[in-house]
Each structure stands twice: as C-alpha cells, then as structure tokens.
Amino acid sequence: MDEYEAQLVAVEQALENTTDEQQREELSTLRTNLQELLALTRETEADQTAQQGDILDDELLRLKSELNELEEAAANVGATKNKDEEQQLKDLRAKYNALVGEKCSAPHEHSWGASSYHNALICGVDDEVIINRNSELDVRLRVLYINPTHCEMLPCNYYLEGECRFDEIRCRYSHGALVPGASIKSYIPPDFPRLARNCPVLAKMPDRLWHRGRVLCANFVEQTCRVRLDGQDHKERERDFQFEELFPLITEKEDELTSEDSSSSPHDESSDEIDSDMDDLEAAHRSRMVELSLFTFKPTEKLGAWEQYTRGIGSKLMEKMGYIHGTGLGSEGRGIVTPVSAQILPQGRSLDACMELREAANGDQDYFSVERKLKREQRRQNKANEKAYARETQRTDVFSFLNGSVLGGGESRHQGDQAAKKAKTNDLQQHSTKTLNVETVRVADDIRRKQRDIAKVKQSLDRNATDIQLQKRLHMQLQSQKQELATLQAHEHRLSKEQHTRKNKMFEF
C-alpha cells in the first residue's frame, strides 16, 4: 500500500515537470491506474479486517462455551470423586474395624533405619487419612507387638490399664504403633515342631523382651527347651524355657523356599534365561582366569604349600570363594602370587644394623625369613633323628640278648660277644666327648628306670606269693629285667672307661 502511494506521488511530480504531450498522456494513464489500484486495495483490506473481527468473535464465544462445559464437567467429576473417596474410606474403615482384636504381622522401623515384621495385635483404627505408596487413600492401624524385641516395642502396662501419666511421645514404652493398613500381613503362628538343635528362636526373658537364641535340645514330652542366648550380656546364657515362651524363627532360606512353593512366578522362562546368562558369564570368567594363569609367573613354591602339615582349611575356603590355583589374588586374578613371607629381625638391633647384616649377606632378601629359619631347624632335627635312629639300631634289646645267649653256641657266642664288645668300643671311639656325656646321662637315666621296674616286680612277687602261675611269669620278667640292667651297666662301664681313657690322653698330651 505504501509502495503504491509512493509511486503515485512520483508520477504526479513527473507530470508537473514534463512538457512533452505524449509522456504526459502516458503518465496520466499510469496515475489513473495507480489510483484505481489503491482504491481496490483499500476496499480489500477493509473486507479482510471485518472478516477477521468476525472470526475472533466466533472463536471467543466458542472458547467461553468450552470453558463453561469443562467447569461443569470438573464439578461433576469432583462431586463424583468425593463421593467415591468417601465411600472408599467408609469401606476401608468398616474393613479395618472388623479386624480390631485380630492378630497380624506388622512392620516396625527401628531407630537405626532397618525395618522388620513382627507379630502384633490390632487394637484400633486411626482417624487420620493418609496416601500410601501407590497414591491411594489409606488409614493407619494402631497395633501392639506380641513378641517385642526392643524397649520401644514393649507395650506400656499403665497405658493398657488407662493409668499412664505420659503421652505417646514422652512415654518410653509403646502406646501402640501406627502402621499403614496396606502394609500388614497375615499372622505367623509359632511352629513348635520345628524346635530342634540349632533352630533360631525368640525367647521371652523376665524383662518381657524376647531375645534371640538357638535351641540346644528340645523335650517334646515336657514341652521344654534348653536355649543358648546370643550376646554376652546374659549371666546365664543357657536356660530352660517352656514352649509358650519361645517363638521359632524362619530363616531367609526357608522363607525364600516357602515363597517359591506358595506362589508360582509368571516369569519363570525369563528367570531361566537370566540364570543361563549368569552361568555363561561365570563360565567365561572362569575360562579367562584359567587363561590368565597360564601367563602368570610360576613361583618355585606353591601358594599354601605349608598346608601339607594341616587340614588345608584355608585353601578350601579360597576355592569356595572362587579362587583358581595358579592365578593371583583378587576378583580379576591380578594380585600377588607368592605369599608375603614373615621375617624375624634380631632382637635389640636397630633397622640400620639389620640392613648392614643383610648387606653383609650379599643383599639376601630372605636373610631374616622365618621359613628359612624353620627349614634350617628342620634339617638339624632330621640329622639328629638320623643319628638317634642309628644309635637305636645298634643298641642290644632284650630279645636280641636272649636270642644271642640262649640260641647261640658257647664258643661262637663267646666269640660273638668279644666281636660285639670290640665293635662297640670302636664305635665309642668315633663319638665326640659331648656325645659321650649325653649318652652317659641317658644310660644313667635308663639304669635308674630299670631299677625302679625291678623293685616293682619284686613288690608284685611279695603280694602274689600264693599264685604259682603269676609267680612264674613274674620270675621270668624279673630275670629279663636284671639282664637288661646288666647290659645297661656294662654299657655305662664302657662309656666311663672311654671317658677316662680320653682324660688320661689329655693329661699325657
């Protein structure tokens, strides 16, 4: 529109400045066309404005009518909803009022945040209306716990008699816990046939609280149980209880089995698939761990090799927890492979002195190792055991003496005795002075012990003088004991002779 008016002004200015007749006619024609175009444009805009005003009026009227309809519908819905909620609350109250005096299983939230279910008695319905977790209307029930395990669960005796001077908040005992009606479950009666050894139970103590414990033995004839109470705050941990004072607990495994048996899951196929996937993941993880063990540094000593002297409970526990032999510690198998060896440093030495000792040993890292020390002591003990075994094999016992003296010939026996004495003398010459001293002490102890045995046999002979058969056996035993004593005394004589000979040689030297 503005463009057309600007063109019209330009044409009129051109007419005023132009003297050529032909151009003036063309400009006049153009001016006439522009004036007609402007007139038509103004008429069109006026019509469009009127039409738009009519459309807006129509839309405004329609919007007002729709708003009125919505307000009427909302009012109807609100009234209907209020009626439904009132009816629902009425039904809920009627339902819960019918449960007053019944037993149930109600939740209890402890002061540390944990929640657990306990058997309780419904004693009333609260007037307050609440919204439960499912955004539904609900009411709260006032319950008293039947098996209270904590002081805040214990019912107040004065409240039950209507004489409590404190309100619900100030009283240290329970005036009834408020729990949502939708959260209560069915009452769990005590299953007394489950009372057996190691069965977890709740036992009623004199303080009216129920304490946890385990059954040691049950007597179904007298209906009594001996229970070992948990914790260290009981002077008498083992007590006898009547069945009425016990409540058998259901463990988590039994609870899971019961829930699985009572209700069949609609997602069995999906759970089977999940289990199979978990099995596949576990198998893949185990194969990866085995593959990792092939590239792991193999120590000279097996991890847990010391358990060959024990029952190996440590390795068994590690296997149950998923440990694979040959891999490192940790869930990924990348931990240490060789165990950390214990070390004992010299007593009263500083760390600098210990480092100097290790450097003097060419930097041996196992210089203070306990295992090396134990192995060294074990080698010493093995050598001592071998020497002791050799000495025992060369000793003449009772049976060898009897066989040589009774079954052997006279001259040959004499020659054998001479050869044996010569061999023993040569054997004594090979021992050190310290070994001879130890052997002398040991032989002296054996002689004293043998003399005590002979004295006991003589006392037995005096006591059993009338029993002929026993007298014969005791005489034979006494003779053998005397022969052994003679052998020991001869051995002691050879030892003392050898020691005396060495002493004389030292004097001569």
Curated annotation (Swiss-Prot):
InterPro entries: G_patch_dom, Znf_CCCH. GO terms for molecular function: DNA-binding transcription repressor activity, RNA polymerase II-specific; RNA polymerase II cis-regulatory region sequence-specific DNA binding; zinc ion binding. Residues 411-420 have a biased composition (Basic and acidic residues). This is Zinc finger CCCH-type with G patch domain-containing protein. GO terms for cellular component: nucleus. It is found in: Nucleus. It holds the Pfam family G-patch. Keywords: DNA-binding, Metal-binding, Nucleus, Repressor, Transcription, Transcription regulation, Zinc, Zinc-finger. It comes from the Eukaryota. Residues 310-356 form the G-patch domain. Residues 254-277, 407-430 are annotated as: Disordered. Transcription repressor. It comes from Drosophila pseudoobscura pseudoobscura. A zinc finger (C3H1-type) spans 155-178.
